[in-house]
């Protein structure tokens, strides 16, 4: 009887019977006789059985939820497409090292003339895995060591221990992750961690020891995360020359907060998008679940990307946020917003805009920042179609402001203060995209609207990170 083998299926064509688009990894062998081929290609088929080879500690219910759509396929192309989608879902669980798909005509006494069997050949991950890699944060690099216990209880649970040593931050943490069967985006996690960070722009050292629990879920076209966090914070001076304003912030505090984040992301890439939009909103309420820190904090991020002629992209972004202390106690330097640097308002030093004391930047309780960008291919297109596609020429205009507000005044007074003393800059440079990990920028910046106390970077400025204004 005719058989069809399809292993590691690549994305399939949206319609038609052009099997040549499947790539090298999909093969068709022994398709005979022609009458059977006609049945498979041009008539309805029925998926009678789905088999799994290679399962060990994985429970049946977690995988049944991922392959249910395969049974709904009505023709061969749809069977292959849905099998490929099921394969991607199985790999996304993070419990298999390899998943291959075999599609064959059905055998046995109950076999229908147009019946098919689909077999998933899987290789489970080992019970304990380790990793070593480097990560790029916002103008910071770090080395990361990790140990992971995948599929701990057989339903895609995961326990992870991670140690990170960076240029400004050292951390280690233990986390437990549990997805909902059949809906990987709906998951629950618990984290224990300790983070020690150095913030030279504020002459501040901070050590956080905490626990958090969060629940993530999709809702229509949005993604939501609800989180509780309890953290013991220890603030200290980074140097003997720290200002008095920083010294009086030193000591211990306990923060217990509830937060919510909503994300709508239609971009084709999070690092250097060519099209799509991002809208992100975060809310945090501290003090009502314990601790000695009380505030309401809100911030948002908006980004729009539009492709233009000649392989160019126009991008615009807007950030903003506000922190309102609750009660008579002022806000902490650890909770305020910071602005400036190669990843936000370019042309200014890292976090060196706004309120400061004796050269130490104290952050602000309200801010906004916006940017206009034009990304074009490199002149004369060197390396076109290859390595040169990772580079883009970059023209930008940034602006923003960071300040403290008098909450006894009305909204008009707040807007007026945020509109005063606007810092802005413009320039041009080159952007390098490092896959989907990070991006590097080398820009020539001309800062404008500089205020007293601001620290500028007039000329060439280098930036590395994953989130840019």
UniProtKB/Swiss-Prot annotation:
InterPro entries reported for this sequence: Bac_surfAg_D15, D15-like, POTRA
BP GO terms, sorted: cristae formation; protein insertion into mitochondrial outer membrane
Function: Plays a crucial role in the maintenance of the structure of mitochondrial cristae and the proper assembly of the mitochondrial respiratory chain complexes. Required for the assembly of TOMM40 into the TOM complex.
Gene3D superfamilies named in the record: membrane protein fhac, membrane protein fhac: a member of the omp85/tpsb transporter family
Protein name: Sorting and assembly machinery component 50 homolog
Keywords: Cytoplasm, Membrane, Methylation, Mitochondrion, Mitochondrion outer membrane, Transmembrane, Transmembrane beta strand
Species annotation: Mus musculus
Residues bearing the modification N6-methyllysine: 255
Binding partners and assembly: Associates with the mitochondrial contact site and cristae organizing system (MICOS) complex, composed of at least MICOS10/MIC10, CHCHD3/MIC19, CHCHD6/MIC25, APOOL/MIC27, IMMT/MIC60, APOO/MIC23/MIC26 and QIL1/MIC13. This complex was also known under the names MINOS or MitOS complex. The MICOS complex associates with mitochondrial outer membrane proteins SAMM50, MTX1 and MTX2 (together described as components of the mitochondrial outer membrane sorting assembly machinery (SAM) complex) and DNAJC11, mitochondrial inner membrane protein TMEM11 and with HSPA9.
Topology in membrane: Multi-pass membrane protein
Organism lineage: Eukaryota, Metazoa, Chordata, Craniata, Vertebrata
Comment text on domains: Its C-terminal part seems to contain many membrane-spanning sided beta-sheets, that have the potential to adopt a transmembrane beta-barrel type structure.
Cellular component terms (Gene Ontology): mitochondrial inner membrane; mitochondrion; SAM complex
Localization per record: Mitochondrion outer membrane; Cytoplasm; Mitochondrion
Family: Belongs to the SAM50/omp85 family.
POTRA domain sequence ranges: 45-125
């Amino acid at each position: 009887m005719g058989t069809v083998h399809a292993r590691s299926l690549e994305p399939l064509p949206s319609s038609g019977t052009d099997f040549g688009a499947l790539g090298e990894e999909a093969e068709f062998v022994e398709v005979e006789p022609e009458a059977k081929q006609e049945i498979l290609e041009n008539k309805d088929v029925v998926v009678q059985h789905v088999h799994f080879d290679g399962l060990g500690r994985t429970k049946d219910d977690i995988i049944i939820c991922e392959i249910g759509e395969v049974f709904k396929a009505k023709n061969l192309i749809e069977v292959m497409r849905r099998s490929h989608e099921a394969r991607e879902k199985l790999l996304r669980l993070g419990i298999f090292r390899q998943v291959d798909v075999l599609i064959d005509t059905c055998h046995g006494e109950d076999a229908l003339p147009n019946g098919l069997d689909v077999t998933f050949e899987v290789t489970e991950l080992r019970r304990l895995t380790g990793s070593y890699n480097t990560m790029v944060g916002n103008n910071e690099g770090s080395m990361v060591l990790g140990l992971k216990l995948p599929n701990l209880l057989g339903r895609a649970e995961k326990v992870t221990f991670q140690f990170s040593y960076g240029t400004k931050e050292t951390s280690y943490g233990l986390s437990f992750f549990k997805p909902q069967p059949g809906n990987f985006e709906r998951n629950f996690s618990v984290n224990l961690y300790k983070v020690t960070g150095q913030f030279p722009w504020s002459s501040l050292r901070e050590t956080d020891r905490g626990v958090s629990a969060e629940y993530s879920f999709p809702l229509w076209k949005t993604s939501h995360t609800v989180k509780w966090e309890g953290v013991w914070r220890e603030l200290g001076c980074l140097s003997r020359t720290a200002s008095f304003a920083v010294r009086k912030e030193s000591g211990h505090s306990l923060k217990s907060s509830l937060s919510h984040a909503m994300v709508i992301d239609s971009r084709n890439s999070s690092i250097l998008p060519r099209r799509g939009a991002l809208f992100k909103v975060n809310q945090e309420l501290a003090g009502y679940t314990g601790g000695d820190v009380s505030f309401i904090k809100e911030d948002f991020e908006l980004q729009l990307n539009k492709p233009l002629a000649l392989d160019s992209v126009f991008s615009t972004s807007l950030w903003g946020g506000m922190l309102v202390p609750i009660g008579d106690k002022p806000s902490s330097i650890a909770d305020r917003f910071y602005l400036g640097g190669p990843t936000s308002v370019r042309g200014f030093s890292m976090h060196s805009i706004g309120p400061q004391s004796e050269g130490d930047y104290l952050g602000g309780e309200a801010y906004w920042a916006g940017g206009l960008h034009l990304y074009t291919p490199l002149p004369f297109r060197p390396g076109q179609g290859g390595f040169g596609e990772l580079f883009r020429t970059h023209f930008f205009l940034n602006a923003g402001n960071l300040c403290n507000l008098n909450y006894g005044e009305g909204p008009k007074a707040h807007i007026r203060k945020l509109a005063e003393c606007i810092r802005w800059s413009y320039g041009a440079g080159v952007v390098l995209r490092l896959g989907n990990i990070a991006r590097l920028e080398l820009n020539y910046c001309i800062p404008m609207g500089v205020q007293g106390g601001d620290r500028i970077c007039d000329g060439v400025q280098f930036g590395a990170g994953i989130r840019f204004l």
